[in-house]
């Protein structure tokens, strides 16, 4: 179920999510989680942007997509109340959140936490 570098990893089952998250934490890279829903128009709008960011930051971050309807407990664990919500984890701790389909804010927040300057 592992994705190649630069790809968004979709997690649809709780046991797959747990394994993928543990593996990502061991990489010491920034973890970026897109909490989304199939019925959410802003989520669909930002999906290609999120995929592009996964390619742009592939050397310093791992990107996940979690459907809040499929993994409700995971969404609750991270305090997700609106979609899309992007949660950033570094060294096992939540370091930032971006709520809404705000691509510039998402890009800037990822760049800040990876230390990677991109245009």
Swiss-Prot record:
One GO location term (cellular component): cytoplasm
Q: Does the keyword Cytoplasm apply?
A: yes
Disulfide-bonded cysteines = 40-43
Recall the GO molecular function terms of this protein's record.
Answer: protein-disulfide reductase activity
Q: Which Pfam families match?
A: Thioredoxin
Q: Which Gene3D superfamilies match?
A: Glutaredoxin (3.40.30.10)
Q: Which domain of life is it from?
A: Eukaryota
Q: Please report the stretch or stretches of sequence annotated as the Thioredoxin domain.
A: 2-115
> Keyword Disulfide bond on this protein?
yes
Q: In which tissues is it expressed?
A: Preferentially expressed in floral tissues.
Compartments it resides in: Cytoplasm
Keywords linked to the UniProt accession: Cytoplasm, Disulfide bond, Electron transport, Redox-active center, Transport
Q: Which residues form a coiled coil?
A: none
Checking NCBIfam families in the record gives: thioredoxin
The UniProt entry's sequence similarity note says:
Belongs to the thioredoxin family. Plant H-type subfamily.
What protein does this entry describe?
Answer: Thioredoxin H-type 2
This protein's gene is called: THL-2
